[in-house]
Amino acid sequence: MSTSKFLFFTLISVILKEITCDIICFNAEEERIEQHLATKTPYRVVANTNDEKVTFDECFPTRAWGIFRHGTRNPSRKQIFRIKTTLTQYRDIILEKGEFCDRDLERFRTWNFQLDDDEQKFLVPEGEDELIELAERIQNRFPDLFFDQYDNSTYKFKYTDTQRAKKSAESFATGLFGRHNIKQIWYPKAEKKDPILRFYKGCPRWKSEVDKNPDAMEQVRLFAASDHFLQLLKNLRSKTGIEDLSADDVHLMYTTCAFETAWDRHIISPWCSLFTRESVKIMEFLEDLEYYWIDGFGYDLTYRQACPAGRNMFEHLDPYSKLPNITLYFTHSGTLLKYLAFLGLYRDQKPLVHTSFGGEHSWRPSKIDAFASNLLFVTFSCPTGAKVLSMHQERPVTIPGCPDDTPLCDYAVFAEAFRERVESCDFDKMCTIS
């Protein structure tokens, strides 16, 4: 072969290789996978970093009540086992047969999952930082209410009986008072079935009719059988070289991508390279459907059972209340989502169903229930009477029934919006299996 022909074919092979790499290589900045990780989305994606002082003419904050989801955590024991076994086997197949560029293959080659079972669901350093920084920003917004000196007549903290909620509360306290001052904080004894922080744990009827009801997952099953998901499954079987790749396997890969993305903003999980901006939306929508029907508006009982938390909110926000000025609860996704629905937030005009994919919808856990998601209500004393500021993810939100042209809602109007739901709250009756 002549030198010119050799150079020509060499150039062609280099060009083809570059084109192939451009097509296959995962680009984290371009795909923005981290915005579509449902309840495993890191809080940094949704956080409001503008922490300027919140002021309203002639008004000053007097009381606050908040619900905080724990920060970024480890997977469950079952997930840890499957990641260490199933995904390790699949990683080896991908290295042998997968259609990935060299850079992505190298990420699989160096991937090493080291978690032990006894670390299941533990809060991780990123989760601690989420709560510390969140507390600092809230304190900056309301310095005249969230004082940096702890007093148990002013502050009330409570968490569920889990390591991740306890550590989240301690991290939040660190952000408010400093690392050397948190030992003086008093916490009430944590309860496994806390009637406010985890009300659904004490609702047998919800467990039977919703949580354990196969019909509640019908829309998820229908979407998993749709052309959208089946094409994704087909593409991933081809890309990975795993011929018998199942829907559960794909979900495990998506979940692992989510956890590893949430843990460290500087590291790209190899499992994220299986997805594109479009295909990850398919995985996200499966989660949207599940959390809509299990924890959202799918069944009335799901959010009606949150009424004890609603009653507690008004007991603490009441401008004449003698309870501590600031009440902070540290809990879980299941509580936050149900309470969002109880408040009437993010309700779409039509129920979310499998055919809703591709359209706009408000119920998106990636945005409303990321790790460390939060709801905060602040009572203000104003010349015209008490008013309430409602905030979700550190931004003002309009509660249905309140005016949408101002962040502040008259306390009387705010209370009236929930009066029927709170006054008729008979938790034991609604949760009894008849």
Question: Positions of the model-derived regions?
Answer:
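Signature for phosphate-centric chemistry
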Residues: 21-156, 160-434
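A positional/structural detector of protein chain ends, strongest at the extreme C-terminus
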Residues: 1-3, 433-434
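Cleavable N-terminal signal peptides of Sec/SRP-targeted secreted and luminal proteins
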Residues: 3-21
